[in-house]
């Protein structure tokens, strides 16, 4: 942004970055010219001549932009300390034009009045803060004794301590208006035709050795009217100034982050550091239509979207249930409600057969393993703060499925729907013979949220492997063949005892808790 050789670390404060393009280059020339004249008077005990003063003026005007910016940045840092902390944000926003002008109060001196500061590290000359603000941001050539000529606008609520440049004006007296007319007339006549005298000059010719009326006005300064107006309107950061513009300042601001986080070290202050930071901020935006990185309400961008999940990336898109189902590769809530009305009272693990297939089809290109770092294209999903899978978390956060990182999706699908989804996974439904089956506990599926079941004609008993070698028995009441372990009840027993104990599956395939599974016989 600046040359590292001319600025120190304290002069990279974003407060200075935002205000520096609005400082007039005339302020550097004016403050230094007054100091040179005062120093010359102390040394020689006489005032500087016109030729010497004009030479100093030309020297100051032709000074390098880096020197002017270094001086302005130091002065802005001093002004920042004199402005109350609660008004610093309003000061930047009003000067840069992002907010209507409001009062900006400064820290008072010991008597409760406007504080005075030295602008050139000189203790022998101090300036009122409101005078400094007018010279810096308006380019008005005021003396240090012109504090009484300043007037505050009627909108100012605290005229004694307000340093808002838009609330400070200069009172113009009758003498000023009178002198301005003749100075402007003389300047315009010289610019028209210096060789030919005008009618006013002919009428005001000295008679009998007496001076004319206009000759009684002596111009003490070395600036002409046109030159003064021209140099007072030139910003200090123009030309070869900082490599940032006002449009860049819209997206990077000091108030979006803490000052400690925004403070940069000296080696990183290259000319491209600001543009790199601005590009990285703009890359984190979802779309150009979003709200800007910095708003006038002082909203911090870091306060939002920190705890939002990846399914909240596109609220307008996910507000439609059909779109939400298409995004996740899962049936929408409306489809779930419709399937729940088909006559089945309780869900079962077999309902995840279609769900697991859709889940693997849609998410397998993204999720490659428990320690992988998924990345999605900006056209589909965009995650400004956190990746899809939190690295220290044991589960993949999903509204319907919990996926343990120790198992792959392929094994998960085989567990839920073995052999095309027509075997042991389909339990818990009424079979065509009227017998019902118990639920098989699955540690990978939470009970409250399960997908819809397949059609009931597809459900039928399937033989399950058991460690016991006893032959399977046949129930006498239901007419259906019991495919698994020996029975411990008779048809004449009570209904509470008409169950067949089922042993656990192969422990290498799935880890089922030690509670016994039972089938209802009858």
From Swiss-Prot:
Q: Which residues form the signal peptide?
A: none
UniProt biased composition (Polar residues): 376-389, 511-522
What GO terms are given for molecular function?
DNA-binding transcription factor activity, RNA polymerase II-specific; RNA polymerase II cis-regulatory region sequence-specific DNA binding
Write out the annotated subcellular location. Answer: Nucleus
Q: Extract the ranges annotated as region (Disordered).
A: 189-211, 259-392, 451-522
What biological-process GO terms show up in the record?
Answer: DNA replication; positive regulation of DNA-templated transcription; regulation of transcription by RNA polymerase II
Transcription keyword on record:
yes
* Comp. bias (Pro residues): 451-470
Q: Does the keyword Nucleus apply?
A: yes
Q: For bias kind Low complexity, which ranges apply?
A: 189-199, 296-309, 342-354, 481-495
Q: Quaternary structure?
A: Binds DNA as a homodimer.
What's the protein name?
Nuclear factor 1 A-type
| Organism lineage | Eukaryota, Metazoa, Chordata, Craniata, Vertebrata
